[in-house]
């Protein structure tokens, strides 16, 4: 006998906003302290347990199978900075990393700077915010959140003595940048609404209560962050939010000086900055460059009136990031939904792309700690290829594999296939689909298929590898990603065409992808498991009502479905 699901009783609540009355029959479920709410949640949990009970042996088998693929004693690829190689590593059975370094050689004795596992003893929760060594390598600034509130307390460790300095700075956020003298650093602080809005300057050994407020953001729409420039010369202070940014810089050799504005904020103008020699290189959407272009200006006169095009706007080529080196500028782009890495030699303007061979993949640059190098580090992965970390020589074009993500067990990437398809949307637009499957899976419409979708905030979904996914690929499932509008896979217009009054494109695109996969015999109607989270949960709630017959099951993680109440909360 099948268990019956609990039904939440209706208790009408009238809400008024701008003269419009709305009736919400489930408003009462917001009250976490109401015993009736607790009872209802317990009933839902009991129902879930009852429905899933026959699958408990399979759940346990899947858990053990997935866990067995993880190499617990793993470490990051060391990064060179000055005389040290910095990295973090995990030990078998440990939940947190240890931050380590070696002096001058990778085979030198290991120095454990900070073992987070030791700090976590006796605590139910711990999360690291920043972990950044000083330029002279003597101090380590690190911050901890001990209760999940994302408010971090900042600590300073003297690496020569192993002792903590007396200062403990509360309510900080993720940003911290050291001055070049290793005696001063800048950090951000949260307000009561959890918005980072203030930047302070602190000198080691002084009372944090006397720290100097160097910037406060008064516009409640904007957040404040800090970054070290690629060259290491500057501290960047940037305000961001609501399709608007504003950047300032300060010389790290003169921490007592004021931050200098680069370009004043204005609505719908987004830009970010890197530096090289006497010039800034700026990624900007000014003058209608929706997919962004690259301009340059002298550091002495950086305002937009002085900007000169360095890479012109090319519709369909989304410029996503810049990274400067002593002799090169690296430009991250997305073209036709796939990431590209472009390397420009600044002396002569020659440009080359890093070559990738698979039909669908993901790749990204990892910013290093050194400016005066010809080595670019990037990560490559695909739906069938675990993450690979490469060092790419920007002069010769050669590359060295520094790390292959370990996948334990009997994993063999040649057992799997990855494809890139295009579905035709309801309005005739092509919708990209990335998918993977085991080579023995029949492509005759009999296979079950997992279809993931998101489509919001301009967030593009990468076609990357997952150890967990192997467990259902090995059982005959196909896994597919619907790159629907609302993301930015095909450029900024892809995002614009999936929001506000065009939000229905997101829903229609997902349905078009599902129908295409059925038509091409990858699966059949009623054999699709739809999945997504947060804004992707809103997508699933909508398509479940539009075309329920397409789906056998829907898994909506933390679904953003009570949109109006949430936004007005």
Locate each region found by the language model.
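Beta-propeller folds
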Residues: 1-375, 379-387, 391-396, 412, ...
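Serine-hydrolase catalytic core recognition
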Residues: 7, 76-79, 83, 263, ...
């Amino acid at each position: 006998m099948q268990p019956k699901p609990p039904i939440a009783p209706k208790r009408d609540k009238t809400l008024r906003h701008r003269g419009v009355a709305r009736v919400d029959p489930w408003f009462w479920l917001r009250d976490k302290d109401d015993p009736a709410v607790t009872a209802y949640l317990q009933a839902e949990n009991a129902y879930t347990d009852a429905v899933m009970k026959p699958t408990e042996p399979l759940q346990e088998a899947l858990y053990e199978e997935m866990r067995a693929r993880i190499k617990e004693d793993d470490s990051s690829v060391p990064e060179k900075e000055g005389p040290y190689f910095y990295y973090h590593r995990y030990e078998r059975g440990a939940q947190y990393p240890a931050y380590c370094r070696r002096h001058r050689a990778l085979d030198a004795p290991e120095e454990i700077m900070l073992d987070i596992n030791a700090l976590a003893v006796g605590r139910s929760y711990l999360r690291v915010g920043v972990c950044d060594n000083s330029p002279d390598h003597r101090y380590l600034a690190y911050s901890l959140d001990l209760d999940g509130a994302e408010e971090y307390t900042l600590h300073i460790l003297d690496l020569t003595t192993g002792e903590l300095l007396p200062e403990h700075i509360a309510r900080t956020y993720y940003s911290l940048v050291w001055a070049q003298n290793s005696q001063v650093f800048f950090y951000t602080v949260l307000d009561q609404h959890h918005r980072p809005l203030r930047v302070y300057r602190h000198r080691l050994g002084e009372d944090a209560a006397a720290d100097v407020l160097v910037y406060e953001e008064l516009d409640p729409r904007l957040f404040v962050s800090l970054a070290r420039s690629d060259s290491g010369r500057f501290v960047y202070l940037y305000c961001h939010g609501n399709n608007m940014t504003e950047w300032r810089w300060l010389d790290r050799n003169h921490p007592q000086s004021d931050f200098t504005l680069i370009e004043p904020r204005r609505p719908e103008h987004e830009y970010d900055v890197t530096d090289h020699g006497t010039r800034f290189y700026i990624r900007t959407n000014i003058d209608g460059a929706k997919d962004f272009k690259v301009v340059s200006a002298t550091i002495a006169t950086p305002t937009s009136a002085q900007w000169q095009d360095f890479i012109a706007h090319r519709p369909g080529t989304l410029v996503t990031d810049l990274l400067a080196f002593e002799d090169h500028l690296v430009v991250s782009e997305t073209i036709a939904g796939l990431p590209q890495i472009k390397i420009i030699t600044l002396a002569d303007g020659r440009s080359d792309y890093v070559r990738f061979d698979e039909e669908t993949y993901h790749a990204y640059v990892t910013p290093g700690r050194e400016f005066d190098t010809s080595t670019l580090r990037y990560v490559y992965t695909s739906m069938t290829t675990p993450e690979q970390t490469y060092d790419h020589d920007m002069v010769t074009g050669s590359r060295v594999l520094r790390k292959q993500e370990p996948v334990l067990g009997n994993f063999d990437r040649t057992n799997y296939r990855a494809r890139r398809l295009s579905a035709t949307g309801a309005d005739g637009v092509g919708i990209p689909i990335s998918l993977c499957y085991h080579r023995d899976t029949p492509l005759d419409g009999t296979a079950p298929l997992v279809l993931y979708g998101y489509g919001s905030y301009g967030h593009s979904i990468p076609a990357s590898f997952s150890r967990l996914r192997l467990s259902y690929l090995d059982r005959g499932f196909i896994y597919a990603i619907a790159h629907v509008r609302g993301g930015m896979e095909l450029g900024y217009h892809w995002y614009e065409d999936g929001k506000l009054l065009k939000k229905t494109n997101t829903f229609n695109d997902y349905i078009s992808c599902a129908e295409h996969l059925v038509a091409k015999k990858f699966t059949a109607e009623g054999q699709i498991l739809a999945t997504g989270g947060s804004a992707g949960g809103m997508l699933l709630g909508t398509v479940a009502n539009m075309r329920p017959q397409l789906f056998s099951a829907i898994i909506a993680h933390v679904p953003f479905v009570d949109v109006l109440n949430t936004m007005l909360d």
